Amino acid sequence: MDSGKDTNGYERVWETNCGAMNSGLIMWVISGSGSFSDHYERDPTGGITFTVTNPGTSKRVITVGAFASRPLDTQSFYNAGRIAYFSSRGPTRNGRIKPNIVAGGYFICSTNSEFSSHSDPYICAEGHYYVPFAGTSMATAVVMGLVALYLQDHSFAIPEEVKEWFSSNAVEDDNFLYPNVVYCSEKAVYVLETRFKGSGKTSEQKLRRVTFSYRLAEMGL
């Protein structure tokens, strides 16, 4: 299906996703990367509204956008902490809030292919094993990891419970109103709490909460 087509989420891909969600499978999709959407060029602070496309508009999946989390050059990186320029903005065409969450995705250090000629050992680590990447695909991996950590302690959680877990642990940004259609559920991070078992001193780090916030950007919504 054309990922650049205007949709409200009620397409065949949406039906497939919902079928998977009904069977208990938790699904997440990226919230679009690229310079154009529906012939509109995106601006440096995250594009324009109504640019989340199918399957990101699906009703029950977790749609993930990206924010600028790791500047490569702090002297010239003006977008740190804000929505990434390539990350699509909501809402859907029928007014639903999307994306559901944004996570760090600009830049993220990730593993490098042995066949890749690209490397930057001064940013991530020595050698050619890790390289910086940017994209909503990187942010989606962050959220996927958080969901996996949650499911370790809640093996039988249904998709709605996982989404509620994110929402109930939201930490709002003092400078914005909530909810909104840009950052939506903004910065997804996790906090670890050290707990002790019995009388021993062996500590166990457990996922305590996921924190993210809703933001209202300069669009009057």
Swiss-Prot record:
Superkingdom field: Bacteria
Pfam families given in the database record: Peptidase_S8
Transmembrane segments: none
Domain Peptidase S8: 1-189
GO BP field: proteolysis
GO molecular function annotation: serine-type endopeptidase activity
Family annotation (InterPro entries): Peptidase_S8/S53_dom, Peptidase_S8/S53_dom_sf, Peptidase_S8_subtilisin-like
Keyword Hydrolase: no
Keywords, in A-Z order: Plasmid
Keyword Lyase: no
Stated family: Belongs to the peptidase S8 family.
Protein name stated in the entry: Uncharacterized protein aq_aa18
Taxonomic placement: Bacteria, Pseudomonadati, Aquificota, Aquificia, Aquificales
